[in-house]
Amino acid sequence: KNMITGAAQMDGAILVVSAADGPMPQTREHILLAKRVGVPNIVVFLNKQDMVDDDELLELVELEVRELLTEYGFDGDSIPIVAGSALQAVDAMIAKGTTKQSENEWVDKIHKLMAEVDAFIPTPERIIDKPFLMAIEDVFSITGRGTVATGRIERGKVKVGEIEIVGIRDNRQSIVTGVEMFRKLLDEGMAGDNVGVLLRGIQREDLERGMVLAKSRSITPHTKFESEVYVLKK
């Protein structure tokens, strides 16, 4: 459930597969879910390379991953695959306190992975010229400040001012008193940003996942609609 919630907002993903063990049952499940919720691009990291002495085994695991990606509708032949060891890279950075390139082969592999992410996963165009809309992912309270709804802005912009809470219960008006991202106060949040929206006069129990925040009177909730449902079996 948590994987679906997060994946539904992704512009791309890094699929981590153990080079020592190869694709596991959950690997197949994660690829399927990524495809179903519309993750457009994937880059693969073959972790634990330090535990694999046989280059042919590493090539076999890479081939398995490519075939699996192709099976579920991704372009398995062109997806970048980088092998490395996250643990070795972290140990090297802790020991030397550096993340510079060309100083450690394992750290270099992480740099290579992120370079592939930058090259292969484009930044999509954000819809900022339409009315604000954000699905609520989580809700929490800040003592002395009020209730915060978090989520990824689907479209438009949000800043201090009037807002409407839509879904599940009757529509309700509120006032945005602050917008934060990574504990920094913003003048405004825009499409694509993961933000926390501080709401005036709203209790934590008034909000839940499935509701949306929107520009006042810009959307209408419906109780009848057509949808496509994917059911996963164990």
UniProtKB/Swiss-Prot annotation:
It comes from the Bacteria. The keyword Repeat does not apply. Keywords: Cytoplasm, Elongation factor, GTP-binding, Hydrolase, Nucleotide-binding, Protein biosynthesis. Residues 1-125 form the tr-type G domain. Its EC number is 3.6.5.3. GTP binds at residues 47-50. PROSITE patterns: G_TR_2 (PS51722). GTP hydrolase that promotes the GTP-dependent binding of aminoacyl-tRNA to the A-site of ribosomes during protein biosynthesis. Monomer. This is Elongation factor Tu. It comes from Prochlorothrix hollandica. The lineage of its organism: Bacteria, Bacillati, Cyanobacteriota, Cyanophyceae, Prochlorotrichales. The gene is tufA.
